[in-house]
Each structure stands twice: as structure tokens, then as C-alpha cells.
Amino acid sequence: MNGSQTLVVKLGTSVLTGGSLRLNRAHIVELVRQCAQQHAAGHRIVIVTSGAIAAGREHLGYPELPATIASKQLLAAVGQSRLIQLWEQLFSIYGIHVGQMLLTRADLEDRERFLNARDTMTALLDNRIVPVINENDAVATAEIKVGDNDNLSALAAILAGADKLLLLTDQQGLYTADPRNNPQAELIREVHGIDDALRAIAGDSVSGLGTGGMGTKLQAADVACRAGIDVVIAAGSKPGVVADVIEGKPVGTRFHALETPLENRKRWIFGAPPAGEITVDDGAVEAMMARGSSLLPKGIREVKGDFSRGEVIRIRNLTGRDLAHGVSRYNSDAMRMIAGHHSQEISEILGYEYGPVAVHRDDMIVS
């Protein structure tokens, strides 16, 4: 349809519960109404929803459970079916079908599984079905979790080939300071590039009860904008917020997409949750950042995590700053063995080699 857009709407726990311990159904009804209205106008809508644990706790009558991962997964297992049932019931009022997609990091860090997820998303949207996405909290451990639904929504936006990503929160947008304790705080209306100054402003400011504060929203915005997707952070309570974003009206904080977005494979590299990380010395930083070189084993100081060859890893400098994401040419065990050694020693150390570089420049995205 001419002029139709694909919009990903992310609803965090603070929006879905209104700050309480239970789902705020009246608020969810209103947001579904807004989304259904845009769906009827020909736009494609994707929902990224939190709230499975809150729904499970409510359904079980707020049981007293130990604060363990197993307890959270129990609540998520009970609540996820209740949550998707709620979305299904509300969208059915408007004759709209929904399709559930539960994802973990493993689905997104592997290129083939990423493409399969993208194909599923495309099929749902092509058939006018609203994908409802959540992290698979019932089975996800710390090692396989994306970690928060802000970053999950950025990945969903890439999967959907979205035009815009709307991050709904309990704040009006990103402020120059925390508006709850600083009366001088001003709303930042437009952002044309995310830099260290903006990251410092976001800091550890929180946006309610969920796992994602403004810092994670900024991370999500960075990923989506690099993929050519506009991002808006706005209050879920603002009347007509979904239509405002579709129509391009001023609302919340708008992050403008890069004019020259990353090509598809590099969107995956930058967006995929890193399976591990490596720390590199100053010489490697100079070679990568100033000369555009590949990362050689000689420059690696430390390897963290367990990852396979072909998985995306994070590259940091000695002070811990995030420099780049890249596809590892070697698994983590091999990387530890060849770290600090010259490339010509790889075959002797491992008994095999996949080339002289640890991460090739073509498989790397500088942060």
C-alpha cells in the first residue's frame, strides 16, 4: 500500500502495569485501539511486550517465592500464555490476528537462525498478522538472554525491516537530567547522533519497574538508527502517541536514522547480542580505528565468554570501552590460545588455521 509504514511498538513493564503489580488492562486496551487504527489504515504493526512475569504473579495470586531465576522463570511460564491470550483477545475485537514469537539471544546471534526469524516475521506481516514478541523468559538463562526488551525491540525492528521504532515508557522522553529530581531538566526533542555526552545524560536513569532504563533505550536507539530506522522514546500515556509517530508529529524524543544505513549483514553484526568479548591493546585499537585494519591475534589481551567460530563478539579497549562488534574467526578456546601471538604462529599453536586474522575488517562494525 502506498505510504504504508512498518512500526515496532515496545511496551515495557512500567507501561503495561502503570507502576502497579498487576497489568493495567484499561491502558493496554487503549494502546491496542491505537495500533488497530493504524493497522486498518494499512500500516504494519509489531508489538514487543514485557509483562509475562507480572501476568504470572497476578494469575497465581501473588505467591511468596524466593528471589531466584527459577522463580522468575516459573512466573514467566505461567504468565506468558496469559499475556499472549490478552493481546489475542484485544486485537480480535478489531478482527486482527496475532502471532507469537518468543526469542532468545541464540536465535539472533546465529546468522541462519536470525534469517529464519526474519522470514517468520515477514510472513506474519505479509498476511496482515500482528507479531507479538517477547524474550523467552521461561527458558532463557543469563547466558542466552538478550537482557532487556529495549534491545530486543531494536532487533525486532531490524527483523521486520521497520521504518520506525516506538519505545513507550513512563517518561515523556529523554531529558537533559532526571526530571523527577531536577526541575531544570528539559526534554530533548531531536537527536541526530548518539555520542558520549548523550550517553552520560542517559546514565543510569530509570524508566520504571522494568529491567531497561534510559541507558538501554539509548543502546536500542543506536542499533536501530544505524540500521536506517527512526526511533522515538515517548510516554505510553500520551493520547494518540502511536498515530503521532506514524504521522511524524513532534512527540517525545526522536532519534533520526543514519542517512547511509548499514547493509543487511552488518545490521545483523551490530544488532546481534554479543556471545562473548575480547579486550585489545592500544596498538590494535590504533590499527582498527585509525587505519581500518582487521584485528590480529597479536593485539588480543583477554578473552571472555564461550563462543563459537562465526558468532558475534564485542571488542573493547583496555579501559573497557566498547569499540566494535565483529564476527569471530575462531572459537573462544582457540582465541585464548592464540591471543598475543603472531599470525604465523596460529597453525603451530592450534594445528589448523582459518586465516591470519581474529576478526576481519569486513565482518566488523565500529561502535
UniProtKB/Swiss-Prot annotation:
Pathway: Amino-acid biosynthesis; L-proline biosynthesis; L-glutamate 5-semialdehyde from L-glutamate: step 1/2. Proline-mediated feedback inhibition. Its EC number is 2.7.2.11. One of its GO terms (biological process) is L-proline biosynthetic process. ATP binds at K10, T169, D170, T211, G212, G213, M214, G215, T216, K217. InterPro entries: AceGlu_kinase-like_sf, Asp/Glu/Uridylate_kinase, G5K_ProB, Glu/AcGlu_kinase, Glu_5kinase, Glu_5kinase/COase_Synthase, Glutamate_5-kinase_CS, PUA. Keywords: Amino-acid biosynthesis, ATP-binding, Cytoplasm, Kinase, Nucleotide-binding, Proline biosynthesis, Transferase. SMART domains: PUA. It is an enzyme of class 2 (transferase). Residues 275-353 form the PUA domain. It catalyses: L-glutamate + ATP = L-glutamyl 5-phosphate + ADP. Pfam families: AA_kinase, PUA. GO terms for cellular component: cytosol. It is found in: Cytoplasm. Changing A117V: In proline hyperproducing mutant; 700-X less sensitive to proline inhibition. Substrate binds at S50, D137, N149. GO terms for molecular function: ATP binding; glutamate 5-kinase activity; RNA binding. HAMAP family: ProB. Belongs to the glutamate 5-kinase family. Catalyzes the transfer of a phosphate group to glutamate to form L-glutamate 5-phosphate. This is Glutamate 5-kinase.
